[in-house]
């Protein structure tokens, strides 16, 4: 979509975008979880859990339910590594609830294992730099936020491209692994594979072993 491309091109000039390595913008909002309305505050997770925060354009659309249900179906894998998932769109909690109450075979979500946050004011989408102003919807942004509330990873897809749960998990595990001192992860690293020391000797040892 030309409007989305235009937005991405000028976004850095128009917004004070959150950058990897900086604190994530805090927010408090209503959400739907377990078919109930709840309140969610991002800073409540500080000191407790990593957060996968992902934005999607709209409820009752086409690519979005494939992503949302894919993350829900593998929620236990995120739980095991102390991570919460939060989905966000500009829809109301009433729209979220109706979508959750719609069966998957009819294009709905069914019960989800994580909250869907309502960003009806569009303030959350704007603060994370994913809002397309002239459309009033969010691009497919995904942010991994650590237990200190710092953004460690971000990706933004255009509207028609869904995201990979496998790659999100791989990146999350790598981020948690490099919290160990003096360890970095090479391309495509997965748990159990060899990492490297970020110095001349360590890198030589790594390359000699592959």
Swiss-Prot record:
Gene Ontology BP terms: cell redox homeostasis; hydrogen peroxide catabolic process; response to oxidative stress
Entry GO terms, CC: chloroplast
Keyword line: Antioxidant, Chloroplast, Disulfide bond, Oxidoreductase, Peroxidase, Plastid, Redox-active center, Transit peptide
Catalytic activity: a hydroperoxide + [thioredoxin]-dithiol = an alcohol + [thioredoxin]-disulfide + H2O
Positions annotated as active site in the UniProt record: 64 (cysteine sulfenic acid (-soh) intermediate)
Transit peptide: 1-10
InterPro entries: AhpC/TSA, Peroxiredoxin, Peroxiredoxin_AhpC-typ, Peroxiredoxin_C, Thioredoxin-like_sf, Thioredoxin_domain
EC number in record: 1.11.1.24
CDD domains listed in its UniProt record: PRX_Typ2cys
GO terms assigned for molecular function: thioredoxin peroxidase activity
Subcellular location: Plastid, Chloroplast
Occurrences of domain Thioredoxin (ranges): 18-177
Keyword field contains Nucleus: no
Domain of life, source organism: Eukaryota
Assembly notes: Homodimer; disulfide-linked, upon oxidation.
Biological role stated in the UniProt entry: Thiol-specific peroxidase that catalyzes the reduction of hydrogen peroxide and organic hydroperoxides to water and alcohols, respectively. Plays a role in cell protection against oxidative stress by detoxifying peroxides. May be an antioxidant enzyme particularly in the developing shoot and photosynthesizing leaf.
Protein family (similarity comment): Belongs to the peroxiredoxin family. AhpC/Prx1 subfamily.
Miscellaneous note of the record: The active site is a conserved redox-active cysteine residue, the peroxidatic cysteine (C(P)), which makes the nucleophilic attack on the peroxide substrate. The peroxide oxidizes the C(P)-SH to cysteine sulfenic acid (C(P)-SOH), which then reacts with another cysteine residue, the resolving cysteine (C(R)), to form a disulfide bridge. The disulfide is subsequently reduced by an appropriate electron donor to complete the catalytic cycle. In this typical 2-Cys peroxiredoxin, C(R) is provided by the other dimeric subunit to form an intersubunit disulfide.
Protein name per the record: 2-Cys peroxiredoxin BAS1, chloroplastic
Species: Triticum aestivum
Source lineage: Eukaryota, Viridiplantae, Streptophyta, Embryophyta, Tracheophyta
Gene that encodes the chain: TSA
